[in-house]
Amino acid sequence: MSFFRGLRRTNKVYNDPSGFITDHAQLIRNQTPAGFNLNNPTTMGLANGTYVPGYNINGAFISNTNVNTVLRNNDVVGMRQLFPDASNNQMNGLTNLRRADNIPDATLHGLQTRKNGVKTSHPETAVRDRVGVENALAQNPRLADYLRGAGYVTLFGVSVYLVINVADLVSSIVEALNRTGGSWYYRGNNGGDNFSNIDACVLRYRSCGMSLADIDEFVCELDPHDPNNVDPLLSFDEARNFCNGYSLAAEGSVCRGSDTNADPSTLQYLDISELEPNQTVQCVEPYDFGDLIGDLGLDWLLGENGFVTASSNSLTSVSNNFTTILLVIGGILLLTFIGFVIFKVVNRSSNNNTS
């Protein structure tokens, strides 16, 4: 039993608090690496009579789900907050444990961090409509030039693809955004530490707010010989009925059963404890332009001056050039005048000598 396997097996709610105490003793206590204090298991009761497992860490209740998320994601900031006594070497040591279990979460977390960074640094990209996309392209001309110069090609990311129509680039981008979203199922292999080693597909029957046309190219085929194998945790009948009564307005997500960090009383909550450690399910909400830029790895094209600033710079440049021209002309006139004075003086001196 590996450390991350034990964390995964206990990432659920319990009907009896003693159940977690027993599981912790069998699955986690003797597998916990040095520096990570998980020696005080406890639970917190919910209104429906179930119990959230967790730990008393530095006098505070920290849910087991939170511990799972932080450690699987390689969330260094989160680890320092939860485990301030852990050294850099101890935190780095978790990388080998994640790699041994082929855990994909750190790679996925890195992508999410990049997407968030794009929108934090360039808030104009947090848009989904034509006007917003046009404005973002105008403020980032190098990105616009790159996309227009790419020609009629398709750019592939992790959860999105962009079919570029040079004749109407903005429509191409908006259409790509409208195709994003859904319950994504990730499986790590060969370490799971880069996207080349992560298999990804969309779980159709958990993607309640997405039309099949928008996700069809990504829908999971878990077993080519068994069309009824459509979900890693649900039977075919359970899957077919999973979205009954779905309401985007009421639920606020395009997914059901795809978020381990959701309130356990909601339809968005996922009991992931039966999945292998190298697998995870995450809800990807529909992208905005900043998400698309981060997913396609185009963030290096951001940051140049936009049209208005560029125009201002052009005017400044023209003004500077005009000043330079005036200075050159003035210098030439001054040199001509000095030359004329010298010529007159020399000529007068020559005439006096002749006389």
Curated annotation (Swiss-Prot):
It holds the Pfam family Baculo_E56. It is a multi-pass membrane protein. InterPro entries: Baculo_ODV-E56. The chain crosses the membrane at residues 150-170, 322-342. Glycans are attached at N178. Keywords: Glycoprotein, Late protein, Membrane, Transmembrane, Transmembrane helix, Viral envelope protein, Virion. Structural protein that is specific for occlusion-derived virus (ODV) envelopes but not of budded virus (BV). Expressed late in infection (24 hours post-infection). This is Occlusion-derived virus envelope protein E56.
